[in-house]
Amino acid sequence: MKKRLTQILSRAGLSMSALTLTFTFVVSGTKATQPLRYKTTGQDSSQSKQVSALVAEGAAAIEHGDTATAKTLFERALSIDKDNVEAHSYLGVIADRAGNLLEAERHFAAAAIADPLSPSARNNHGAILLKLGRTRQAATQFETSLRLDKNQPSALINLAQIRFAGNTPEDLRAALDLFKRAQSIAPDFEVARSLVVTALRLGQRDEAANYYRDYATRVSGAQGEMVTPAARAELGAALLEAKLTEEAVKELSAAVASDQKNVEAIVNLAKAYRAANDIDSAGRLLETAVANGLDDALIYAALADLYESIGRAENAIPAMRLAVERDPKNEGYRFRYALLLIDTKAPQAAIIRLKEALPLFPDSARLWFALGIAQYGFQQTNEAAQSFTRAVEIDPKAAPALAYLGMINAEQGRFPEAIALYERAIATNGQFAAAHYLLADVLVKLSAIDVPRAETHLKRALELDPTLTQARLALGKLYLRDEHLAEAAVEFEAAIKADPNLAEAYYQLGRTYARMKRTAEAQTTLATFKRLSDTQKEQSETERREMLRRLANVRF
């Protein structure tokens, strides 16, 4: 009967959203009944038969769990034939299972020396070397094994995992090729999963999606040991990160179905549903988790995000409060709770909560920043300036705080100071679209308007954020001022397309059409402006809040 040696367990991991490969390093088994390859110098046929019998008896003892007897039998075989490959291999496995890696390596090395042309002996030696952390030597053994026999799934998988752990593009491409070769020889759901993982790590989204389909088919039909719920949750999170939403939903759903208390998997599945625009499923999932007794801060925080996204602030605020209560040392939750209160026109409540939080986090730049926003919203301008200044003292790269200080100075007519602050914000974060817009807004208020510079910053703002309607409107007004009527019309029309209720855009576009002698269009556009003008005050407040939100959402 053909028997495989017990697998040597060793695990190789990779770092991508805590994602790991799930299979172990494997050892190629020797067969108790195959012709033995060992030196026979000075050994007669009776000794050879005795050695074969001892090895076969030892293998049977291992099958019955009698390791002590098996070890004695294999050692007796080696006392007769010190180069017996199978005896060394079995003793290597026994030593490995006992945690004696050095003894295991000695036996596997002896087997490889005794039969240097044996692919399985090379593979076994490589596996134990890897377990000892001798990666380079292990790779050499696997490469030699594959030169002797290129169609060994175990050696291909082992070498692929080493290349994968190298984590360079070249190593990852090599790993992908090795996994593909192994899969073509012996299709397996764990190798299929590894192909998905490797493609994700290489940023090959389309290939990862294709590999995932094969993996999903194989894992659904696999018998016996399956991928663990934790491993499925890890893969689902990586798929979500790669924006493979459909695949993420499928994998995370399987993880949650197998482990309904895995909070992180539940939260990620809710995110995947939201990414798929399935808000109802996300809400049901999170609310059901709470109803089932998962009283966890992560769940409440995810619920708060969901409620906020659909305009249910009355539900978002208590959910975020519960997240803070369950995890009071989470600075991020305190910050988000404060912003929720500010966004729902409750700055005074935010001030109270932030003053409770700051003694716990006295050096938190973003909590000082949030306090400044709340104070600014509560018209405590001096106090807000002090809070923003404190945020910048803690974190000189706090671009949003610099921008707010610029706004305060601009409102008080200190334009040079405002310009300097906006420039600092941009120098700190060149991708800060709102700061480019705010700087341009001040530049056009100077007695000597710097039109080219303002235009440059407005265009940059729109490159960074095409949805920044205020910048588009301001750019159109610059064009109109300089009689670039066609360009102005384009910007105003784009602003109206982005926000059909933007009254000022209709007014400016009507003026532009009039100058272009497009009288009928001018009259229609100005009529729309008059209809919307009654809501102008409310609209201005909405625009102001939108700008404040953009500033608050920029990460430190």
Located regions from the model:
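Long, contiguous interaction/recruitment modules in multidomain scaffold/adaptor proteins
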Residues: K2-L9, G13-Q47, I157, R193-V197, ...
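Terminal, low-structured helical/coil segments at or just beyond the last alpha-helical repeat
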Residues: Q34-G42, S194, D214, M226-P229, ...
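Alpha-helical segment of the N-proximal tetratricopeptide repeat
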Residues: K49-I80, R97, E234-E241
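Helix-start (N-cap) detector for alpha-helical repeat units in TPR-like alpha-solenoids
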Residues: V51, V85-E86, P119-S120, P153-S154, ...
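Structural signature of tandem alpha-helical TPR/SEL1-like repeats
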Residues: E63-L73, R97-A110, L132-T144, G166-R181, ...
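Structural marker of alpha-solenoid helical repeat scaffolds
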Residues: I80, A114, L148, S184-I185, ...
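Canonical tetratricopeptide repeat
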Residues: Y90, N124, N158, S194-L195, ...
